[in-house]
UniProtKB/Swiss-Prot annotation:
Leading EC class: transferase
Protein name per its UniProtKB record: 5-methyltetrahydropteroyltriglutamate--homocysteine methyltransferase
Residues annotated for Zn(2+) binding in this entry: H653, C655, E677, C738
Function: Catalyzes the transfer of a methyl group from 5-methyltetrahydrofolate to homocysteine resulting in methionine formation.
Residues reported in the UniProt entry to bind L-methionine: I442, G443, S444, E495, D610
Source species of the chain: Bifidobacterium adolescentis (strain ATCC 15703 / DSM 20083 / NCTC 11814 / E194a)
Binding residues for 5-methyltetrahydropteroyltri-L-glutamate: R17, E18, L19, K20, K117, R526, C527, W572, E616
Amino acid sequence: MSALTSVSGFPRIGQNRELKKIIEAYWKGNTTLDEVRATAKELRAKHWKLQQAAGIDLIPSNDFSYYDQMLDTAILLNVIPQRYQRLAFENPEETLFAMGRGYQGEKGDVTALPMKKWFTTNYHYLVPEIDSATDIKLNSTKPFDEFNEAKALGITTKPVLIGPYTFLKLARNPQAEELDYDKGLVNAVAAVYAEVVAKFAELGVQWIQIDEPYLVLDKEPGDVELFKSLYAKILPAREGKVKVLLNTYFGHIADVYETVNLLGFDGIGLDLNEGKDENLAAVEKYGVAEKTTIFAGVINGRNIWRNNYAVSLGLVDALKQVTANVAVSTASSLLHVPFSTEGEDGLADDVRKHFAFAVQKLDELHEVAVLADASDDEKKASAELAANQALFDGTRVAADPAVAKRIASLTDADFVRQPARAERQKEQREALNLPLLPTTTIGSFPQTKEVRAERAKLRKGEITKAEYDEFMKNQIDACIKHQEEIGLDVLVHGEFERNDMVEYFGQNLNGFLFTKNAWVQSYGTRCVKPPIVWGDVSRANPITVEWSAYAQSRTDHVMKGMLTGPVTILNWSWPREDITHEQQTQQLALAIRDEVLDLEKAGIKVIQIDEAALREKLPLRKTDWHKKYLDWAIPAFRLVHSAVKPTTQIHTHMCYSEFNDIIKDIDAMDADVISFEASRGDLVVLDAIHDANFETEAGPGVYDIHSPRIPSEQEIEDRIYEILKKMDVEKVWINPDCGLKTRGNAETWPSLENLVAAAKAVRAKLAK
């Protein structure tokens, strides 16, 4: 007999990204919707059977999605804005894709829903829009269909839902500054969830998992009452036939645990990775309701390192001192880790044994559950426990003394750039001689099949390095020529040689490991393959200098060097767990600093250091923002560029994030120019820029590159005027909101032509 095991969620893209490939083929018209549905059904069955074979008791269903689970929840509740309903698609999947990607075709022209980061992960969710026209009602059978689908295979699953509290807190009203949680809205949402719970009870469901990750955030006035009022209406629908697990993750719920414990949930899921100390203290202080099971989230759903069984067992034992009702669970959905280490033969066995991807985490979960109920003698005799402990005894990788020496020699002066920004801006305007409202792009240009094929040929040894370089130079030449023709002011080389903005740098730094197939979903069908920080990081040789110098030699325009910043490299990698994030970021900062100075020596006058993921790992509770993150993340960025000349213009770029609350910290990065991804956020960041007297020049994105639609010149011109209402014209740059790598040339160049034309039109009007 072992403790009950529960998986919060499982990756849905497939071991070989089957879901991504079939959906993208459908978007291109190369397959049918029936084929998409068939592939999805095969994947669901495979994933359920894998979990069943691993001995998992509570296997999730309804964790699958074609695009995003928040989007699925919006559709479940009929939270579908009128602009999408008017498209009148025959198939619900088409409506879902239009909401996620936008639509431009014979049925109309609509933008996508806003997209934001899912808490502190690199996953993105679609933001539901609730307005006066929204008619909340049960609108989908997806959760029930997938439960029945698994049941037909002989597997009784645990349906998973995003909870009503989290859904409402993440939704927005596009017609108002804030969503009003009025009684009518709250009752309508609660009624749908109660109806869902009742239907599950009729179907013979034993457990329902309702995810409420928003509970781990700071509470605003009224939040606790909102939560209580929702569940006061939902929980009675159980009627004693079905159990409800309230699942929380990405932090602790110590401030509301007492309330949650008294509401009568059958299970409470606690994250014992990120919220370990606070959650344990709350359980010890307030106890556990008699009929409630605590689901101990001990298997990390956010990183790829092996679980330390001794630590996990200690956490389970601590809970057992309070209650006998303890289940063992993943700390969060396994959506955020790759599928399996199987097939990663590029990693040596003595390296690979330190990693656990989703499939391996199933085995870890089962083994921890068995050991949790074992006697002391059985634990001592356990080969699994001994083998696991051996992974953590001794030193995994030797430290690099040169890296340690360099960090120890840093002084306060290394983190401060001279002269002050206002003086630098004067010198840069004179040196660069750019027009008002200068136009540029964020860095990458579309990577065609031919570009990807050429990289693959080099990797397989089918072409020489010289042949590869010649091909890439031709790509750069064509990209530069096209940028010159449409009239962009600051050019880029296109980044054709880069597979990924993080992996590319990792491949050229000491201390990283790489996988063949460790893909994770970022948004929609977009997947990323993060590198692994294995040891101390340093730069062996220049990385980008040759390409940037070549590009500058091919044009009289200003050429922008393109780098990825240290915080983003760490946040979009699998970080080490044996040293702190601060230590790893400082190592990365010194490596990128060397590259910045070499670019400057090579004649590159504008250098962009992307910190796309800076906001991503900001702690969810404000009291932790500075002491646990910003106090070392911001100085790390300054360390990268502090030694350049005053005339060298330092740019940075930030992706899907909410910046308003840390705008002063962003200004403190001391960059000369920053581009924000802002087009899907309705430019709300402009108010923060205005109110904070933001000193950095800025380019809020004027169109959304994550949608295939082409913005008109007038649309972009209107956007520019919106920006100018809040910003000094001399501090405004005009750019798309992100890199163009994942777009096609067919939409990229017309969009940029409209961008340049709009900027010129505004300049002309301002000159009158």
